[in-house]
């Protein structure tokens, strides 16, 4: 199981074309979702997300109104103050959590999330293989890119390719 983040980034980028083809394969084979879910559950059991936190350093976190309310309560600040202090407007995403170029999410301290119990839904569901809105197939759009960020995504996609005999070109 590959967990070194430098290798994950390099290998994830190297196999991105294969992962794009895999996404099309999965869309055309609905029964594949159960197999992929089973593999993802197995990989998630073997990798401790909280020891990695790479998603917190490299991903954009879109916030819902519910997330703002939850953060407001946790931080004991009114929603307008949370928005002013901890978010940025994004033309494509609405409100997003502020990020620091060096460490990522403003709530990340080393690999610890300072708001873990009250983190946004998108963070709770990450890497969106098992949890998240809609079907796994509907969430597959971002998986080729996430394979270079998340050891769980990378290892899940590689294990699935092995299991089904997917022909690699990358």
Where are these regions (language model features)?
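Short loop/turn segments that flank or connect secondary-structure elements
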Residues: 1-170
């Amino acid at each position: 199981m590959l967990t070194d983040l430098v290798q994950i980034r390099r290998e994830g980028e190297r196999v991105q074309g294969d992962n794009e083809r895999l996404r099309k394969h999965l869309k055309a084979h609905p029964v594949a979702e159960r197999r992929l879910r089973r593999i993802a559950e197995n990989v998630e059991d073997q990798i401790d997300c909280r020891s990695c936190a790479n998603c917190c350093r490299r991903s954009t976190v879109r916030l819902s109104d519910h997330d703002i309310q939850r953060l407001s309560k946790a931080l004991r600040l009114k929603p307008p103050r949370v928005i002013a202090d901890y978010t940025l407007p994004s033309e494509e995403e609405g409100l997003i959590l502020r990020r620091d170029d060096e460490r990522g999410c403003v709530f990340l301290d080393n690999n610890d999330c300072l708001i873990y119990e009250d983190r946004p839904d998108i963070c709770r569901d990450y890497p969106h293989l098992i949890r998240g809105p809609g079907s796994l197939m509907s969430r597959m759009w971002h998986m080729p890119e996430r394979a270079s960020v998340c050891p769980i995504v990378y290892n899940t996609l590689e294990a699935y390719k092995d299991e089904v005999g997917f022909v690699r070109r990358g």
